[in-house]
């Protein structure tokens, strides 16, 4: 069974050293409206852009690449 992007990102929460990806994971966890069941890049990217959760979408792109490599 494939992990959703949300499920993958939860392993980055509570990192020993905070970084942009761990901060994104925390923000996703705190956002009750985040599309938790999605595996779709466009859906998640659009959601993040509209929510203003990130200062730069390059953080999401980096996290997405890690997600794809881990699948």
UniProtKB/Swiss-Prot annotation:
It comes from Bacillus cereus (strain ATCC 10987 / NRS 248). InterPro entries: UPF0346 (IPR010673), YozE_SAM-like (IPR023089), YozE_SAM-like_sf (IPR036806). Gene3D superfamilies: YozE SAM-like (1.10.150.260). Belongs to the UPF0346 family. Pfam families: YozE_SAM_like (PF06855). This is UPF0346 protein BCE_2336. It comes from the Bacteria.
């Amino acid at each position: 069974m494939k992990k959703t992007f949300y499920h993958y990102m939860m392993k980055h929460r509570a990192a020993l050293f905070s970084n942009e990806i761990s901060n994104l994971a925390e923000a996703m966890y705190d956002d009750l409206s985040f599309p938790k069941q999605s595996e779709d890049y466009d859906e998640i990217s659009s959601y993040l852009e509209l929510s203003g959760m990130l200062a730069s979408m390059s953080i999401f792109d980096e996290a997405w690449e890690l997600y794809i490599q881990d699948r």
